[in-house]
C-alpha cells in the first residue's frame, strides 16, 4: 500500500475516534432520531401510532411531542407526552401538561375532562404557565364566564414573553370585555 493511503486511513480513523471521545454515541443517536422522524413524516403510510418511544430518552420524548404538536399530529403528540409522563415522572414540568391539554383540545375540539385535568396539573406545577392560563381563559370564555376568563388571560399576559401570544391575549381580552359590557 501507498504511504498516502495509509496516512489518509489513519487520519480518518483518528477523526472518527476523536469524534466519539468528544461527542459520544448520544450525538449519533440524535442524528438517527432526527433522520427517523423526517423519514416518518415523509412516508406515505398512515401514521397510526406505530412509533416505538421506548428507545427515546426524556429530552427526545419531549422534542418529539413538541414536533408532533407543531406538525398538528395531535394523537402522536399525546402518545409521546403520556409516555414521557409514564417513564420519567420526576422530570415532568407544567409545559408537558399544558401541551397535553392543548393537544387534547385540538384533537377533540372541546374542553373534555382530559383537557381540564391537564390544565389543572399544569397550573398546580406552575401557576403562571401561559399556555395553560390561555386555555383556562378560553374555557371560561366558552362558558360565558367572562370575568374569570379575563383573570386567567391577564395573568397569562403578565407572564408571557412572546409578542404574538401577547397580541392574541389582548384581542381575546378585548372581546371578553365587550361581552361583559353587553
Sequence positions of predicted segments:
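TPR/TPR-like (Sel1-like) alpha-helical repeat modules
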Residues: 141, 146-164, 171-174
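Alpha-helical adaptor scaffolds
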Residues: 67-70, 82-125, 131
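Alpha-helical segment of the N-proximal tetratricopeptide repeat
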Residues: 35-87
Amino acid at each position: 500500500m501507498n504511504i498516502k493511503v495509509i496516512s489518509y486511513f489513519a487520519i480518518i480513523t483518528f477523526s472518527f475516534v476523536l469524534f466519539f471521545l468528544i461527542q459520544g454515541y448520544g450525538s449519533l443517536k440524535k442524528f438517527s432520531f432526527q433522520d427517523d422522524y423526517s423519514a416518518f413524516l415523509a412516508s406515505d403510510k398512515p401514521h397510526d401510532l406505530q412509533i416505538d418511544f421506548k428507545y427515546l430518552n426524556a429530552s427526545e420524548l419531549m422534542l418529539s411531542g413538541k414536533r408532533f404538536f407543531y406538525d398538528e399530529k395531535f394523537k402522536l403528540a399525546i402518545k409521546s407526552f403520556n409516555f414521557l409522563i409514564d417513564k420519567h415522572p420526576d422530570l415532568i414540568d407544567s409545559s408537558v401538561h399544558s401541551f397535553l391539554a392543548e393537544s387534547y383540545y385540538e384533537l377533540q375540539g372541546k374542553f373534555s375532562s382530559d383537557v381540564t385535568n391537564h390544565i389543572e396539573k399544569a397550573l398546580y406545577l406552575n401557576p403562571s404557565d401561559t399556555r395553560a392560563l390561555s386555555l383556562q381563559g378560553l374555557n371560561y370564555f366558552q362558558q360565558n364566564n367572562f370575568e374569570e376568563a379575563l383573570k386567567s388571560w391577564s395573568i397569562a399576559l403578565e407572564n408571557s414573553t412572546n409578542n404574538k401570544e401577547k397580541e392574541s391575549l389582548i384581542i381575546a381580552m378585548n372581546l371578553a370585555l365587550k361581552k361583559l359590557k353587553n
